[in-house]
A protein has these predicted regions:
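Soluble or luminal CAZymes and related metallo-dependent hydrolases
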Residues: 96, 142-145, 213-218, 255-259, ...
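Conserved, mostly hydrophobic/aromatic
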Residues: 24, 77, 104, 114, ...
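Substrate-binding/active-site clefts of carbohydrate-active enzymes
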Residues: 43-44, 64-69, 78-231, 235-252, ...
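Short, flexible loop/turn elements at secondary-structure junctions
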Residues: 15, 78-83, 118, 137, ...
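Conserved alpha/beta catalytic core and glycan-binding cleft of carbohydrate-active enzymes
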Residues: 43-53, 230-232, 246-406, 434, ...
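Carbohydrate-interacting/catalytic domains
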Residues: 1-71, 80, 90, 95-105, ...
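Short, contiguous acidic/charged loop-to-helix segments that flank catalytic cores in large enzymes
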Residues: 133, 137-141, 209-210, 249-254, ...
């Protein structure tokens, strides 16, 4: 190989062909080192060889555009377990995920967020141990299968958002580690920090964000996903361990912050309309401020200020111990001026593992498919789809997947049939959230007012709107109590007939739901809850009503 002035090396191999395997042999004073190309688009295994890959692909007919962020509904999934193959010894692959796209389309989601697919050690993993970030996991089908999957998803009207890991690499099967044999303090060498800045919860493998070659490497990776794979958005894992050393915000890492700014700035410049999402969970509003204003420039961020109080509210065994003030704060929390710069959820891969379980399982450990589990988990889901923010659910949540998430246990699709009514409940909520029928535009709007909160009776009501008026104003009333509440008087923002668009107690969702006699109501003049009109509603136990004009 020949050295270039910028520190890069190159070689022309006229006899090389697509599909050929290769490796770099690096000879230094430290010895000889066999290394996989850090930019390899395909590898045989995480410890094998690089493969010469043709990045070309027939994207003809793929003119997909991501929905506006206030109209996104995200479905997080893990390729290896979402729809496992018949061969139980191997993980699921992209083609097996493709066979379930019809389910997702019918459910109504318009974006899939895929847990990391960069080549990792072994065949089964969550994906957060990337060995080769430019190569698609071969056990999932490799790069061609991933492109085919993305094109198929786009044909179904579904965006693909990819989870990437830049807060650390590896730590196992990591050829970048001491790449040329050099290191200090027995750390990672030229591409990593070689002091305490290298230390993360996952190993001493934090890349050196202050090194130009490393920054370019990570930017090139982001741009590869957007260009070669036509990914519609990027979710950045644990950004608190990029912008700080200890993840707690007390040891800032300026190199990491400027890296995030640069990556987001480049995405916005080169691919306007694509979304970038931070998983930071430190309720830091600067993450979603514009780079020009000193922020990191993310489009949105996962919101710990929503998921934790909502889960706490529905998993608390005794009604009297539920905090409606915490629910109110979760509904109303916002980082900056945009209600949709947060992603809200009651389940994610982290929230249903690491010592935690699926919401129905936590509600009723001995009866996770029972009445209490179904009623209160769907109560949480209703909050996800009616509160301001970008709603997200985790694979299998729509049919009461139980236990906790593991990369060796596939989703139980038999429950899709067994709990078809709960699936319909999710489908109806998503339809309302996206205003598919043209009478709930307010759920896509910026404005929210929680105007009624009765902590003793455990009832909360809030108003959502965009511009206001007919087909826009939405009122959500939620009962976090085990008993029905009849003739319950609350305020309404406008007079006239308010149509009942959704009742989570409908028996069509589950045979043992009560179909409590809730109906359209007429709001009459009379100041109530600070609003000029009022009406009496009837709520089933642990139920949500959605009204609109």
């Amino acid at each position: 190989m020949q050295a270039e002035e910028n520190g890069n090396w190159f070689a022309d191999a006229a006899e090389a062909h697509v599909g050929d395997q290769y490796k770099f042999l690096i000879t230094t004073k430290k010895g000889e080192f066999s290394r996989i190309d850090p930019y390899a688009r395909e590898v045989t295994t995480s410890v094998g060889n690089a493969i010469i890959h043709d990045p070309g692909f027939d994207w003809q007919g793929d003119d997909f555009h991501l929905a506006p962020w206030n109209e996104l509904v995200i479905y997080e999934l893990h390729v290896g377990t979402f729809n496992d193959q018949e061969d139980v010894n191997n993980p699921g692959k992209f083609p097996s995920v493709s066979t379930r796209l019809g389910h997702l389309k019918k459910l109504g989601v318009n974006a899939i967020q895929i847990m990391p697919v960069g080549e990792f050690a072994g065949d089964r993993s969550w994906g957060y141990n990337p060995a080769h970030i430019f190569s698609v996991e071969i056990a999932y089908g490799g790069p061609l299968a991933f492109k085919q999957f993305i094109k198929r998803a786009h044909q179904e009207g579904i965006a693909v958002i990819l989870d990437v890991v830049y807060n650390h690499l590896g730590p196992s099967d990591l050829d970048l580690w001491q790449f040329d044999g050099w290191s200090e303090n027995n750390f990672g060498g030229i591409y990593f920090y070689n002091d305490e800045r290298a230390i993360t919860p996952w190993g001493k493998t934090r890349p050196d964000y202050g090194r130009g070659e490393v920054r370019q490497y990570l930017l090139d990776n982001v741009l590869m996903w957007l260009e070669e794979y036509r990914i519609d958005g990027i979710r950045f894992d644990c950004t608190q361990f990029i912008r700080t050393i200890n993840g707690a915000g007390t040891q800032d890492l300026p190199d990491g912050w400027s890296l995030l700014q640069w990556l987001n700035d480049q995405v916005a410049e080169k691919y306007p309309g694509r979304i970038t999402i931070a998983e930071d969970l430190q309720h830091n509003r600067w993450l979603t401020k514009d780079v020009g204003a000193g922020g990191a420039g993310f489009s949105s961020q996962w919101d710990a200020m929503f998921v934790h109080p909502i889960r706490q509210a529905v998993t608390t065994p005794q009604d009297e111990n539920r905090s409606l003030e915490a629910i109110r704060d979760a509904i109303c929390y916002r980082y900056n001026d945009d209600a949709f710069d947060r992603v809200i959820y009651s389940e994610s891969h982290d929230e249903v593992a690491n010592g935690k379980e699926r919401v129905p399982q936590e509600i009723s450990p001995n009866d996770p498919k029972g009445w209490y589990a179904r009623k209160r988990s769907t109560l949480a889901a209703a909050m996800v789809f009616t509160a301001p923010g970008i709603p997200m659910i985790f694979q299998g949540q729509e049919f009461l997947e139980g236990g906790w998430f593991r990369d060796t246990v596939p989703v139980n699709w038999d429950q899709n049939v067994e709990f078809h009514g709960i699936v319909r409940l999710y489908r109806d909520l998503i339809r309302l959230r996206l205003n598919r029928d043209g009478f709930t535009r307010g759920l896509c709007g910026q404005f929210t007012q929680v105007y009624h909160l009765h902590d003793e009776r455990k009832v909360i009501a809030f108003h959502r709107w965009d511009k206001g008026g007919a087909a826009d104003d939405v009122v959500v009333v939620a009962n976090f109590f085990r008993e029905a509440q009849d003739g319950y008087v609350i305020g309404f923002p406008a007079a006239g007939v308010w149509r009942l668009r959704f009742n989570s107690d409908w028996q069509g969702y589950s045979d043992d739901f009560q179909s409590h006699p809730s109906s359209d109501i007429v709001a009459e003049a009379g100041e109530t809850d600070g609003l000029p009109f009022y009406a009496a509603v009837s709520l089933g136990p642990y139920s949500v009503l959605v009204y609109s004009l």
